[in-house]
Amino acid sequence: MISLLSAATRIACRQMTPEQLTALHASVERASCLSARHDWERKATAHAELFTVLGDVTGDRDLARLVSSAAGRLQDLFMTVGPAADGMILSSRRRLLRELRAWDADAAAWEVEHHLRGLRYMERLARGAGSGAISQAS
């Protein structure tokens, strides 16, 4: 999943139009306006939506379908790590937008890889300590 989303990010960065960048920014803003504490499931869905938009930006239908499927898995990951990860996710999204605005495909892909590795680590901790351990940390 990490390699797929990283590759899609790299491709999207190289091909996106200013309008598509605006759509990505809007996706991040929608997610940032939702409450993590009161409706984490909805916010997790909004966070994952960014990758669906990135998949569409690649212009490759098959890749977009794979990315959309990975975004579903990513939503499950967000649900597992819980709302305590919201600040980390939003910070990563903002760094990703900064790299995309700079048209730096390698830096954007690195941000995705780094962020998802961190979330996978948090997921392993949450599963090892019980499903509510991390989400109760906030």
PLM region descriptions:
Residues 3, 18-80, 91-98, 107-119:
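Conserved amphipathic alpha-helical segments that form helical-bundle/coiled-coil interaction surfaces
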Residues 61, 81-83, 124-128:
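Short, charged/polar low-complexity linear motifs in solvent-exposed/disordered segments
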Residues 85-87:
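Active-site loop of classical SDR/Rossmann-like NAD(P)-dependent oxidoreductases
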Residues 105-138:
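C-terminal effector-binding regulatory domain of bacterial HTH transcription factors
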